[in-house]
UniProtKB/Swiss-Prot annotation:
The lineage of its organism: Eukaryota, Metazoa, Chordata, Craniata, Vertebrata. One of its GO terms (biological process) is lipid catabolic process. Residues 1-18 form the signal peptide. Pfam families: COesterase. It comes from Homo sapiens. This is Putative inactive carboxylesterase 4. Expressed in placenta. SUPFAM superfamilies: alpha/beta-Hydrolases. One of its GO terms (molecular function) is carboxylic ester hydrolase activity. GO terms for cellular component: endoplasmic reticulum; extracellular region; lipid droplet.
Amino acid sequence: MWLPALVLATLAASAAWAGHLSSPPLVDTLHGKVLGKFVSLEGFAQPVAVFLGIPFAKPPLGPLRFTLPQPAEPWNFVKNATSYPPMFTQDPKAGQLISELFTNRKENIPLKLSEDCLYLNIYTPADLTKKNRLPVMVWIHGGGLMVGAASTYDGLALAAHENVVVVTIQYRLGIWGFFSTGDEHSPGNWGHLDQLAALHWVQDNIASFGGNPGSVTIFGGSVGGESVSVLVLSPLAKNLFHRAISESGVALTSVLVKKGDVKPLAEVGLRLVRLRLDTPTSLALCS
């Protein structure tokens, strides 16, 4: 009796999801509607709804460089969330190498670079027509705080196999993400503050994607693990996540912690472009 019932239940579930597949997934976030796509994984009747390139903050351009991330601008149209956002500005060869070396996806992602990078991707196996609340896992990519991107890591298999909502996030890298004058004019750690902004967005919006904002795990590898460690220690991250997995890398990794006066080095760089450095404020503004 059990086997026929199980077969019928499986067929019913497949038929229900087949109906959902006739139209792409549409979710209303606090900033506006996003349109994703269903992707099926071999061996699973239930597809995964995938949303790519959702903005969680304003583009950090112009006067927003070297400042706190600002909330994303709302939109009054349906935003297409079916293509990957650009990687943050970085060395193209190194970025391509890291992308190809560490990716878990089969297809190649065209290399696009931009300072406009504060986007996240969501992979959810939840039935968005119901009030499902699945655990959430937020992935922070590695790359030495210099290279890398969310698009390198495909959350499809993890979402389908473990029945969790997977979020992969991006943040500012290199000098744009970690430049500091060592004082209040430009305290630095902009990249880590971007990660906090993404976690705030998750708290505010992930329930609409079938995720449980009260069960968020952050995890990352290499310098992504360092970022996890930083967030665990930061009082600014209180109540934004509930579990943490640091896959190598910690907050006090020696190569990532530098002390000293940044002004002499900055003066050398600015002389190359014939700019005068008078104050930390002018340094931040002209960088």
